[in-house]
Regions:
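A short, Lys/Arg-rich alpha-helix, primarily the initiator
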Residues: 1-23, 70
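The alpha-helix within a helix-turn-helix
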Residues: 18, 29, 58
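Short alpha-helical DNA-recognition segment
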Residues: 22-41
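Residue-level detection of the helix-turn-helix DNA-binding "recognition helix"
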Residues: 33, 44, 73
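Short, basic-rich loop-to-helix N-cap that marks the start of a DNA-contacting helix
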Residues: 46-59
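Short, charged recognition helix plus adjacent turn
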Residues: 59, 67-97
Length: 97
């Protein structure tokens, strides 16, 4: 069975936090002190989690900023591998010892 690609952190936020709590994007934005557009773009995969947003989410949900940024980094790396991984392997060669 193939590994599933990592989910965008906004999808995780929407499915694992907002929906179970019955919380709207607007309510979360107000609780975090950020524009609603930031949360909307995030949960629709159109925006990345920044360190500022990670700190706010961590404080609100009782998690860590590293949790949120780690998810974003994993997602970003997988996207980069899909876009440019083969080209990099073909053109960048390991340094000889």
């Amino acid at each position: 069975m193939a590994d599933l690609p990592p989910a965008h952190p906004g999808e995780v936020l929407r499915e694992d936090s907002l929906r179970p709590l019955g919380m709207s994007q607007d309510a979360l934005a107000k609780a975090l002190g950020v524009p609603e557009m930031r949360i909307s773009e995030l949960v629709h995969g159109k925006r990345a989690i920044t360190p500022d947003t990670a700190l706010r989410l961590a404080r609100y949900f009782g998690t860590s900023a590293e949790f949120w940024l780690g998810m974003q980094m994993t997602f970003d790396l997988e996207q980069a591998r899909e876009r440019t991984g083969a080209a990099i392997e073909a053109t960048v060669h390991p340094r000889a010892a």
